Curated annotation (Swiss-Prot):
Gene: trpA
Name of the molecule in the record: Tryptophan synthase alpha chain
Keywords: Amino-acid biosynthesis, Aromatic amino acid biosynthesis, Lyase, Tryptophan biosynthesis
Source taxonomy: Bacteria, Pseudomonadati, Pseudomonadota, Gammaproteobacteria, Enterobacterales
GO cellular component terms listed in the entry, alphabetical order: cytosol
Organism: Citrobacter koseri (strain ATCC BAA-895 / CDC 4225-83 / SGSC4696)
A Pfam family reported for this protein in Swiss-Prot or TrEMBL: Trp_syntA
């Protein structure tokens, strides 16, 4: 959790927002996935949001479902994902690493064992996408036991009660949803969410990062202008992986250019 605090403090000093890319671990293969993650970091990613392939990803649009299928086709297992996480942490000791998960993957290991393993490999946060705040107690309690930040999604229609709960239970950062629905770059992010950001700040929530449909530098700038601490981009990045599956070198070149442009927008 300290890695997030350190990151946001450093960014504040530099008057920058955070740019956080999302990819699925093991897409399109373990080896190329590790190359991709190195490239994202070299190009300026401030933190990582990583998915573990899961057979029924509810909140994911078609782009990220395809990423999951590619990882499955490469034979990637949750155990391998944790081995990858340990390697990433070894190589990049300071970058915050977050997991975006589904509850079944946590249950299959046992909640306590899952978070213990997260701590062991150096994961900083876990967002369990299909567990609402009111059912989150066993997850967030285990997370805090192992010094892992529980992340909560703040939807655009959140009422005051939900905002207070998110502020109270969340650590690390708050995942600010640009709009309701499934992920995807083709569903452009809606208007910036000034009122939510103000309320979250009033209740001392962890810094908000805006996600869902973030695919251009202008949207990153817009998120930061609305008061968000930064932006998360998933589908736009995964699309570049999909487009260049047959050409790994070109894939890394395009990913580097995209992340460089998105990170530059946090300094505007």
């Amino acid at each position: 959790m300290e890695r997030y605090e350190n990151l946001f403090a450093q960014l504040k000093d530099r008057k920058e927002g955070a740019f956080v890319p999302f990819v699925t671990l093991g897409d399109p293969s373990v080896e190329q996935s590790l190359n991709i993650i190195d490239t994202l970091i070299e190009a300026g990613a401030d933190a990582l949001e990583l998915g573990i392939p899961f057979s029924d990803p509810l909140a994911d649009g078609p782009t990220i479902q395809e990423a999951t299928l590619r990882a499955f086709a490469a034979g990637v297992t949750p155990t391998q994902c944790f081995e990858m996480l340990a390697l990433i942490r070894q190589k990049h000791p300071t970058i915050p690493i977050g997991l975006l998960m589904y509850a079944n993957l946590v249950f299959s290991k046992g909640i306590d064992e899952f978070y213990a393993q997260c701590e062991k490999v150096g994961v900083d946060s876990v967002l369990v996408a299909d567990v609402p705040v009111e059912e989150s107690a066993p997850f967030r309690q285990a997370a805090l036991r192992y010094n892992v930040a529980p992340i909560f999604i703040c939807p655009p229609n959140a009422d005051d009660d939900l905002l207070r709960q998110i502020a109270s239970y969340g650590r690390g950062y708050t995942y600010l949803l640009s709009r309701a629905g499934v992920t995807g770059a083709e569903n452009r992010a809606a208007l910036p969410l000034h009122h939510l950001v103000e309320k979250l700040q009033e209740y001392n929530a962890a810094p908000p990062l805006q996600g869902f449909g973030i695919s251009s530098p202008e949207q990153v700038t817009g998120a930061i202008e609305a008061g968000a601490a930064g932006a998360i981009s998933g589908s736009a990045i995964v699309k570049l992986i999909e487009k260049n599956v047959a050409n790994p070198g070109q894939m890394l070149t395009e990913l580097k250019a995209f992340v460089t442009a998105m990170k530059a927008a946090t300094r505007a």
